[in-house]
Amino acid sequence: MGSRAELHTLLGGLSFLLLLMSGQGAKGGSFKESQGVCSRQTLVVPLRYNESYSQPVYKPYLTLCPGRRVCSTYRTTYRVAWREVRREVQQTHAVCCQGWKKRHPGALTCDEAICAKPCQNGGVCVRPDQCECAPGWGGRHCHVDVDECRTGVTLCSHRCHNTAGSFTCGCPHGLVLGPDGRTCAEGASEPPTSASILSVAVREAGREDRALRREIRELRGRLERLEQWAGQAGAWVRAVLPMPPEELQPEQVAELWGRGDRIESLSDQVLLLEEKLGACSCEDNSLGPGLSRRR
């Protein structure tokens, strides 16, 4: 009797442990599947829309039946018709926990972490306010440059120069940097590397970019002056013309164009006469006979 009671107690304890383990496993799996989701809501959304369907149409007609009798029958045709449809659909809505957000409004997961201050220098926000930095950078927001030359690891055989997010190696006089970019060896200077060529190209591109920006500024200034001149010219033309330019007929435009040519010719003649008169001078500041000086 006692052994049976002990067995019953043991089985009950095992059942409780199995139930507890299964509950923990389900809870852990649910958390892993729904990372960043605090709750889910099922909403009933009413829909109302129009849909097309094939509507039968019965058309009667007369035909000749056996026995030379006239019979009335019908044939069925179909046409496209529209009808209003109303239905309700269930839509699941996920509520994100603090520090998480959805990749798009309709997503059912909240797998994009939020960092109050953006991760810098190629860092990625992997958990709320936690950045995963790119190699060569550290700090909470990946804003601190890691000095590889002071990590205690020998990276260069001679000289190590720290750069932003990386490092470069250098060699003393008489030695050249090897193909690995870290060790130095004796030998003639190697041809320029793609990195040095790229650096020169970048500098040239920078100069060209500055020249292009300067030219763009000059062109913008010219364009502004042309627009101002065009506005003044348009106002002058509208003041001189007997009617708005858009109401002129082709023959009127041709006549005005001819007048403009004649005015330009007369203007050139007047300018020539002014130049000739400016070159004339009288001796002793005296005028010719029959001419009197105005006072």
Curated annotation (Swiss-Prot):
Keyword set includes Disulfide bond: yes
Keywords assigned: Calcium, Coiled coil, Disulfide bond, EGF-like domain, Glycoprotein, Repeat, Secreted, Signal
InterPro entries: Dev_Signal_Modulators, EGF-like_Ca-bd_dom, EGF-like_dom, EGF-type_Asp/Asn_hydroxyl_site, EGF_Ca-bd_CS, EMI_domain, Growth_fac_rcpt_cys_sf, NOTCH1_EGF-like
GO biological process, one term: vasculogenesis
Chain coiled-coil ranges: 202-233
Listed GO CC annotations: cell surface; extracellular region
Domain EMI: 34-112
Disulfide feature: 38-97, 65-71, 96-110, 115-125, 119-131, 133-142, 149-160, 156-169, 171-184
Residues of this chain annotated as glycosylated in UniProt: 50
A family per Pfam: EGF
SUPFAM superfamilies referenced in this protein's UniProt entry, alphabetically: EGF/Laminin (SSF57196), Growth factor receptor domain (SSF57184)
Molecular function terms, GO-annotated: calcium ion binding; signaling receptor binding
Subcellular localization(s) per the UniProt record: Secreted
Occurrences of domain EGF-like (ranges): 111-143, 145-185
Signal peptide: 1-25
PANTHER family: EGF-LIKE-DOMAIN, MULTIPLE 7, 8, EPIDERMAL GROWTH FACTOR-LIKE PROTEIN 8
Protein name per the record: Epidermal growth factor-like protein 8
Organism (species): Sus scrofa (Pig)
Lineage of the species this protein comes from: Eukaryota, Metazoa, Chordata, Craniata, Vertebrata
